Design a protein with these regions (language model features):
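Conserved Rossmann-fold NAD(P)-dependent oxidoreductase catalytic core, especially the SDR/UDP-sugar
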Residues: 90, 112-159
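Short, small-residue-biased leader/transition segments that mark boundaries at the very start
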Residues: 1-6, 255
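Mid/C-terminal beta-alpha module of Rossmann-like enzyme folds, strongest
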Residues: 232-282
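Catalytic helix-loop patch of NAD(P)-dependent Rossmann-fold dehydrogenases
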Residues: 141-186, 207-211
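N-terminal Rossmann NAD(P)H-binding glycine-rich loop of SDR-like oxidoreductase domains
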Residues: 16-36
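NAD(P)H-binding glycine-rich loop region in Rossmannoid oxidoreductase-like domains
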Residues: 62-109, 113, 139
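Substrate-positioning beta->alpha
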Residues: 162, 166, 192-197, 211-233, ...
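Flexible, glycine-rich beta-alpha linker
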Residues: 137, 180-197
């Protein structure tokens, strides 16, 4: 039957599970994994938007990270049919929350639960990729404007950064766990919405910025993150942490000027909001 053939094919290729597969970074990782010939499983919620997951070769696996018992059943059911995954790329997480406690719940506790379940079921992959963030460090070199190094001590100043840091430290605390952590800076590219809103604002002749002090910005293109992830898989690296950026530093004004240039240099009114107001609002 076609099911048997499909199952045989799945067993004969290296398998990769991408959690958060319907998201910005996850959807591009799925595309590249397919292009490289992996058996690709998209880890999604039942409510996930599948707009960028249309390829017929994608296998879907619903994962309920909020309920440990359900998650265990879903993963053990997969193991029974197909065995464990060769690689897991964990993109699932929260970047925006109304309640700050949700960052801790989703980014730390649910990641911990996921990893604990994999260990319990003997489903530890060859490599567990964790997509973290530069935000784990916080503004530690804000006064000197010098580059962050691996030897710096993270001091996150947001609930988001703290939740990702706690998840990182948990992975690092497990002896012999084959993690690879990537900390992208500001990620841009197709399907991204935040920088798109900034471009939209400039096109409508308003350049809005926060604070009156110098702001240095760093960026990385989404497809460069994808290439880094698969290079790490190719090289079979383990228990390493990497920053991902394009190697350049931009002043906030220079960044908005770049967007203006791409939009044909529309005139703009520059508005600045004091940082204290943003902190009160958030």
């Amino acid at each position: 039957s076609s099911d048997v053939c499909s199952s045989d094919l799945i067993h004969n290729v290296e398998s990769v599970l991408v959690t958060g597969a319907s998201g910005f970074i996850g959807s591009f990782i799925v595309e590249e994994a397919l292009r490289r010939g992996f058996g690709v499983w998209a880890g999604i919620r039942s409510s996930s938007n599948r707009e960028y997951l249309q390829d017929k070769k994608i296998h879907f696996l619903e994962l309920d990270f909020a309920h440990p018992g359900e998650l265990c059943a879903q993963l053990s059911g997969h193991k029974e049919l197909y065995g464990k995954f060769d690689y897991i790329i964990h993109c699932a997480g929260a970047t925006k929350c109304v309640d700050k406690n949700d960052f801790e719940r989703v980014n730390y506790r649910q990641t911990k639960c996921f990893v604990d379940t994999l260990r319990e079921l003997d489903m530890i992959p060859r490599q567990f990729v964790f997509i973290s963030t530069l935000s784990v460090f916080g503004p530690i070199r804000e006064k000197t404007y010098t580059p962050i190094t691996e030897k710096d001590t993270p001091v996150p100043n947001t609930a988001y950064g703290l939740s990702k840091l706690k998840a990182e430290r948990y992975l690092q605390s497990i002896p012999d766990f084959p993690y690879v952590i990537y900390r992208p800076t500001g990620v841009y590219g197709p399907r991204e919405k935040d920088y798109f809103l900034m471009a939209k604002s400039i096109r409508r002749h308003t350049d809005f910025s926060v604070g009156f002090r110098r702001q240095d910005l760093t960026f990385v293109y989404v497809k460069d993150i994808v290439q880094a992830v698969f290079l790490g898989i190719e090289k079979q690296i383990s228990r390493r942490t990497y920053f991902l950026a394009d190697g350049k530093v931009y002043r906030s004004r220079a960044f908005s000027d770049l967007i203006r240039k791409e939009l044909g240099n529309p005139f703009v009114i520059r508005l600045r909001c004091p940082l204290i107001i943003l902190k009160v609002v958030s």
